[in-house]
């Protein structure tokens, strides 16, 4: 990698523990840059960065940037932050995360993965197939790739795979040689102002692909399909279950631990190619769609069919994407506890559908709504997102820094679920109350799936042990 000299001075990341910031910091550190950062609290990511030799300070204070040559901020950091204000006062350049990522991307050919949902898993799948094909990409992802134990890795090849976050529009800085759009849903309207402007941004993202590149779009998603006529001068490759897709999945068979399917690829010359007997060790039709886009990228590199099969077979998944975090023994059987990041109604539906595919008995959903504003804006969608769950437990809303909104809380969601016909929904106020409620009702081969982007992951981590303890005390 050549480009910005490593002698530019110390680069300070404000909020370095964030999943997007930490990946860039890790790659730049491994390239030889002087990297440090600050965050408001300790955590897994902070510990990992320190183990790499990166200095991380806890708390945001003006003195943290006194030796910095550049300050990098995420979209979560705003004016008024003492480190940002100190940098501006001392004329230290302040750059957004996407701008720094764009600098790294400018030095390599890039696969940029965008979409409202599925970006992290898709980015991981693309990286897995390139690895299997003998290409060693640099990867910057929005989640921990289990096979790496990190969300980032510095590779030796001239290619980079990045997750392109659309939340604040900054993904338009990320010009991919190859681009993927998984879906387009009405999210981040506080930034864009309208859903039409969200769609405009994705059209621009695809239009930024160079003439020698390509964009892969999921034709199954109606909004993605609707933007196809607006992009006339770029090479577009569609994928999905649709008979019109250029890359299509057929012969789909849900099996233990995932899905088996055949990919059918229609070339521009009309020739048909089949990659049969692909095993994807992840449940859910949405993950097959994600896999099809990764196959499309792999074919651009002429990666052989056998390597594609091998890459998927060895795919270890992503942390907090249908991750098994606990098991409760009941007689000769057990109950699995699954942790998943899904927090938008579309994601929740997809995850519960995947759980339903793999469940032998009941699917028990535990959801922690993320942000009062999201629950308020999408209340109707949330109320109909849990049809594949036999039972729903709703934890208190994870505020993520927001102020409460009157009438928008866990009880409101429970009431709405019941009004929309759900037979079993109730609120719980703590991990302990959840464990007590579940201890008496679970049966062998049930699946408990914890959903949300907040600290519900901590609830999930301790749930199996808590339930087991309660059942032992009460001889259940």
From Swiss-Prot:
Pfam families per the UniProt record, alphabetical: Mur_ligase, Mur_ligase_C, Mur_ligase_M
> Does the record's keyword annotation contain ATP-binding?
yes
Q: Which UniProt keywords apply?
A: ATP-binding, Cell cycle, Cell division, Cell shape, Cell wall biogenesis/degradation, Cytoplasm, Ligase, Nucleotide-binding, Peptidoglycan synthesis
| GO MF, one example | ATP binding
Q: Which reaction is catalysed here?
A: UDP-N-acetyl-alpha-D-muramate + L-alanine + ATP = UDP-N-acetyl-alpha-D-muramoyl-L-alanine + ADP + phosphate + H(+)
The keyword Cell division belongs to this UniProt entry's keyword annotation: yes
Give the signal peptide range. Answer: none
Which biological process, per GO, is one annotated for this protein? regulation of cell shape
**Localization in the cell:** Cytoplasm
The EC number on file is: 6.3.2.8
User: Where mainly located?
Assistant: cytoplasm
Residues reported in the UniProt entry to bind ATP: 115-121
InterPro entries for this protein:
Mur-like_cat_sf, Mur_ligase_C, Mur_ligase_C_dom_sf, Mur_ligase_cen, Mur_ligase_N, MurCDEF_pg_biosynth, UDP-N-AcMur_Ala_ligase_MurC
The task this protein performs is described as: Cell wall formation.
Protein family according to the UniProt entry: Belongs to the MurCDEF family.
**Under what name is this protein listed?**
UDP-N-acetylmuramate--L-alanine ligase
**Species this protein is from:** Zymomonas mobilis subsp. mobilis (strain ATCC 31821 / ZM4 / CP4)
């Amino acid at each position: 990698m050549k480009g910005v000299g490593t002698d530019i001075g110390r680069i300070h990341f404000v909020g370095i523990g964030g999943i997007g910031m930490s990946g860039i910091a890790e790659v730049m550190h491994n390239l030889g840059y002087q990297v440090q950062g600050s965050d408001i609290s300790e955590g897994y990511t902070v510990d990992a960065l320190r183990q790499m030799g990166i200095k991380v300070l806890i708390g945001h204070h003006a003195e943290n940037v006194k030796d910095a040559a550049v300050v990098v901020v995420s979209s979560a950091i705003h004016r008024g932050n003492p480190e940002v204000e100190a940098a501006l006062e001392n004329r230290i350049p302040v750059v957004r995360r996407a701008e720094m990522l764009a600098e790294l991307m400018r030095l390599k050919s890039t696969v940029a993965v965008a979409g409202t949902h599925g970006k992290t898993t898709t980015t991981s799948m693309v990286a897995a197939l390139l690895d299997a094909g003998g290409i060693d990409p640099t990867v910057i992802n929005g989640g921990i790739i289990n096979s790496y134990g990190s969300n980032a890795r510095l590779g030796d090849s001239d290619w980079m795979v990045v997750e392109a976050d659309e939340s604040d529009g900054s993904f338009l800085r990320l010009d991919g040689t190859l681009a993927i759009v998984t879906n387009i849903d009405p999210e981040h309207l506080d930034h864009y102002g309208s859903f039409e402007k969200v769609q405009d941004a994705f059209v621009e993202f695809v239009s930024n692909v160079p003439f020698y590149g390509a964009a892969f779009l999921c034709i199954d998603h109606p909004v993605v399909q609707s933007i196809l006529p607006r992009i006339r001068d770029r090479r577009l490759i569609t994928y999905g279950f649709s008979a019109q897709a250029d890359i299509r999945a057929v012969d789909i068979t849900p099996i233990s631990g995932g899905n088996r399917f055949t990919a059918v690829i229609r070339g521009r010359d009309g020739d048909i190619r089949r990659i049969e007997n692909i095993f994807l060790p992840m449940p859910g039709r949405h993950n097959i769609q994600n896999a099809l886009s990764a196959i499309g990228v792999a074919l651009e590199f002429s990666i052989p069919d056998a390597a594609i099969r091998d890459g998927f077979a060895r795919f270890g998944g992503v942390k907090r994407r249908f991750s098994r975090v606990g098991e409760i023994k009941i007689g000769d059987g057990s109950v699995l506890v699954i942790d998943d990041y899904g927090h938008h109604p579309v994601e929740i539906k997809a995850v519960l559908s995947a759980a339903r595919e793999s469940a032998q008995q009941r699917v028990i959903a535990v959801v922690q709504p993320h942000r009062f504003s999201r629950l308020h804006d999408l209340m109707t969608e949330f109320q109909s997102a849990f049809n594949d769950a036999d039972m729903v437990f709703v934890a208190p809303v994870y505020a993520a820094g927001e102020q409460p909104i009157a009438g928008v809380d866990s009880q409101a969601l429970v009431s709405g679920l019941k009004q929309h016909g759900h037979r079993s929904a109730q609120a719980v106020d703590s991990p302990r109350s959840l464990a007590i409620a579940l201890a008496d009702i679970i049966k062998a081969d049930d699946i408990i799936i914890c959903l949300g982007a907040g600290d519900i992951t901590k609830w999930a981590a301790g749930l199996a042990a808590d339930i087991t303890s309660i059942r032992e005390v009460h001889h259940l």
